[in-house]
Amino acid sequence: MTENTHAGRLIVLTGPTAVGKGTVEAKLRADHPEVWVSVSATTRAPRPGEVDGVNYWFLTEDEFLAREAAGEFLETAVVHGMAHYGTLLKPVEEHLAAGVPTILEIDLQGARRVKQRAAELDLEVVYVFIAPPSFEELERRLIGRGTETAEQQARRLETAKVELAAESEFDVTIVNETVDQAAADLWSVIAKEYGL
């Protein structure tokens, strides 16, 4: 085991599809610009308004698989049976070493892979689960988003049931009643872990 060069604990943020993870982390970043949120790589097509390098690193499947084979990812997963997602390791390590509050917003598969690799990489991690007030509210949010077909929505809701059942695997649960409250709760976790 190598000497720990990380000055802070990595915050892994997970929750079911359409729970508002991205909205909560955007509010957190607006209120606390000192927080760095890792930009995931993906092979899925950009949604309207998404920008390469800001929302995701949009890669072809060949590019993604080559970087995965080169060991450049902390974790990777195939999500909803459709697209590859992954977290590039080097930027995470650099931000942690600099003491910058660092968040990974990833799905359940990714969080489980980080758990598997954390000891090997000498990472200290806090796992945070963002939960909806109810399954019905989650369904309403997903349908209201209007970015998926009915078939994709049904597949995502089935995945969400599995994700919700895994809540007990996490250190902290934050219920996303409102974005402001959930972002404030997440900041409380970060402030505690980073001594802010």
Curated annotation (Swiss-Prot):
Localization per record: Cytoplasm
Gene3D superfamilies named among the record's database cross-references: Guanylate Kinase phosphate binding domain, P-loop containing nucleotide triphosphate hydrolases
Pfam families: Guanylate_kin
HAMAP family, per the entry: Guanylate_kinase (MF_00328)
Positions of transmembrane segments: none
GO molecular function, one term: guanylate kinase activity
Catalytic activity, EC: 2.7.4.8
Coiled-coil blocks: none
Alphabetical UniProt keywords: ATP-binding, Cytoplasm, Kinase, Nucleotide-binding, Transferase
Boundaries of every Guanylate kinase-like domain copy: 8-191
GO cellular component, one term: cytosol
Chain residues that bind ATP: 15-22
Species lineage: Bacteria, Bacillati, Actinomycetota, Actinomycetes, Bifidobacteriales
Chief place of localization: cytoplasm
Protein name as catalogued: Guanylate kinase
